[in-house]
């Protein structure tokens, strides 16, 4: 089902195809200026009135994976976050070691410019959001919550558990976002 978002955008349920393939296909639609992939939905923004029908949406469900290899990022991390010790007690694991052992994929972008929701978090680190969000997290903070990990691209409020910080990388700036949907990310210490 396609939902109008004003006169220049639509939103529809996210098909099972890979996020990279969806973005590539939707960007090829006539008049598309931006595509936002969320966990359950996709929004497409247009220069004028959307010229999309149900056939466009249906075709997304059968997309092959994007053949272009994903970009790989290795982010240097210092695991010294405010919640690290508490999470180690709660989960019973060495949070830094387990977090750094995984390879993550950018599944969606949102919340803030350059905020990448990374999937691939070890299930032992799957914790809910904090009961009380913090008023300010520093740009570069590495955090986990609700089955995701992320690096805060800007100073902002946040309700995720802080486990460390990225050094030598700027997640968002005048040149845009360092990460894009489908990119792969590893953390090293």
Question: Model-predicted segments: where are they?
Answer:
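Glycine-rich active-site loops that engage anionic ligands at enzyme catalytic sites
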Residues: 1-189
